[in-house]
From Swiss-Prot:
Promotes RNA polymerase assembly. Latches the N- and C-terminal regions of the beta' subunit thereby facilitating its interaction with the beta and alpha subunits. This is DNA-directed RNA polymerase subunit omega. It comes from Bdellovibrio bacteriovorus (strain ATCC 15356 / DSM 50701 / NCIMB 9529 / HD100). Disulfide bonds: none annotated. GO terms for molecular function: DNA binding; DNA-directed RNA polymerase activity. The keyword Metal-binding does not apply. It is an enzyme of class 2 (transferase). Belongs to the RNA polymerase subunit omega family.
């Protein structure tokens, strides 16, 4: 995959907002040392996260409402 686009990712995620939340959380996991599921020449965690979503390696879980998701992201970012 030469370039990853938002449209590639939206085939796997219900909307752009969910995509942003999911990619941000995954990028933070990669930053903390999680192993990437795709091989990439890029050291950018956001790009790696987007590639993982586009390839279907990272799943979307629709169990949190929007407010709970925002609180969880804020909590994760403050760690």
């Amino acid at each position: 995959m030469a370039r990853v686009t938002v449209e590639d990712c939206l085939e796997k995620v219900p909307n752009r907002f969910a995509l942003v939340l999911m990619v941000a959380k995954r990028a933070k996991q990669l930053l903390k040392g999680a192993e990437a599921t795709v091989s990439t020449r890029s050291n950018k965690y956001i790009v790696s996260s987007l590639r993982e979503v586009a390839m279907g390696n990272v799943g979307y879980q629709d169990s949190l409402d929007a407010n709970e998701a925002i609180r969880q992201i804020e909590k994760d970012l403050n760690k």
